[in-house]
C-alpha cells in the first residue's frame, strides 16, 4: 500500500514557507504540518517547566509527554490554545537554540511522520525534505534575502500590535541563519532534488501558484 503524497517545503526563518505551505494544503485539500511550530511548542513547554535550553537530554525526554494538536489553524498544547504564545520572538529564539540538540530532533521525527495521512500532506519546516520525508513527491526550498524577510516579519508584528525594530529583526535573522546553517545536526540546506523558489520579489499568491504548478 503506497503512502499518501507529501509536499515538503523548507527554507530559512521568515521566508514565508508557513504561509505558502498552509495555502497550498488548503488548495489541494491536504493536511498541513508546521514542523517549526513543534520546536516552538517544546520551547514554550520547557520554559514553563524551567528546563535549561542547553539540557538536550531532559528536553528530549519532555517531547513524548506533550499532547499536541492542530485544529483550524489553531495550535494546542496539553489542551491549551497556544497559537499566539508560541509566536513571541523570545520563544522563536529559544526554539532555534534548542533545535541544535539531536535528542529533540530524533524525538520529533516520529511525531512529524504521524501527520502523513490521506489524501496527502504539505509539511513545512527545517529538514522536512531532507530528513523527515526524503521520499516527498515535491521538495521546495523557499528563500528570500535577509532584508526582505526582516521586512515581512516587521509588518507581521506591527499588524499584530507588537512593537519591533527593523534593524533588530534583521540582525536576529542573520544570526539565526548563521546558526542554522552551521549546526552539526540537520543544518539548513537545500535537499537533494529540491526546487529553489526565490520569493524576495514574489507575492504570496505568486509563490503558491508556482508550487501548485510544480506539483
Curated annotation (Swiss-Prot):
Which Pfam family, any one of them, does this sequence belong to? Cytidylate_kin
Nucleotide-binding is among the record's keywords: yes
Establish whether keyword Transferase is in the entry: yes
Q: Where in the cell is it found?
A: Cytoplasm
Listed under GO biological process in this entry are: pyrimidine nucleotide metabolic process
Keywords in alphabetical order:
ATP-binding, Cytoplasm, Kinase, Nucleotide-binding, Transferase
Show the Gene3D superfamilies listed in the entry. Answer: P-loop containing nucleotide triphosphate hydrolases
Q: What is its EC number?
A: 2.7.4.25
Tell me a GO cellular component: cytoplasm
Q: What is this protein called?
A: Cytidylate kinase
Query: What is the native source organism of this protein?
Result: Polynucleobacter necessarius subsp. necessarius (strain STIR1)
Please name the taxonomic classification of the source. Bacteria, Pseudomonadati, Pseudomonadota, Betaproteobacteria, Burkholderiales
Amino acid at each position: 500500500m503506497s503512502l499518501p503524497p507529501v509536499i515538503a517545503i523548507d527554507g530559512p526563518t521568515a521566508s514565508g514557507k508557513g504561509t505558502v505551505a498552509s495555502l497550498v494544503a488548503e488548495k489541494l485539500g491536504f493536511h498541513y504540518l508546521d514542523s517549526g511550530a513543534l520546536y516552538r511548542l517544546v520551547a514554550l513547554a520547557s520554559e514553563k517547566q524551567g528546563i535549561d535550553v542547553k539540557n538536550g537530554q531532559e528536553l528530549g525526554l519532555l517531547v513524548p509527554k506533550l499532547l499536541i494538536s492542530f485544529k483550524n489553524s489553531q495550535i494546542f498544547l496539553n489542551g491549551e490554545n497556544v497559537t499566539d504564545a508560541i509566536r513571541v520572538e523570545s520563544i522563536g529564539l529559544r526554539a532555534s537554540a534548542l533545535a541544535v540538540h539531536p535528542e529533540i530532533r530524533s524525538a520529533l521525527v516520529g511525531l512529524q511522520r504521524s501527520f502523513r495521512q490521506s489524501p496527502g500532506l504539505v509539511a513545512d519546516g527545517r529538514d522536512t525534505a531532507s530528513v523527515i520525508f526524503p521520499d516527498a513527491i515535491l521538495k521546495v526550498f523557499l528563500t528570500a534575502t535577509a532584508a526582505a524577510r526582516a521586512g515581512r516579519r516587521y509588518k507581521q508584528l506591527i499588524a499584530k500590535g507588537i512593537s519591533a525594530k527593523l534593524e533588530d529583526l534583521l540582525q536576529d535573522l542573520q544570526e539565526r541563519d548563521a546558526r542554522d546553517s552551521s549546526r552539526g545536526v540537520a543544518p539548513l540546506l537545500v535537499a537533494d532534488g529540491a526546487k529553489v523558489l526565490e520569493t524576495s520579489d514574489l507575492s504570496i499568491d505568486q509563490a503558491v501558484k508556482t508550487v501548485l504548478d510544480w506539483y
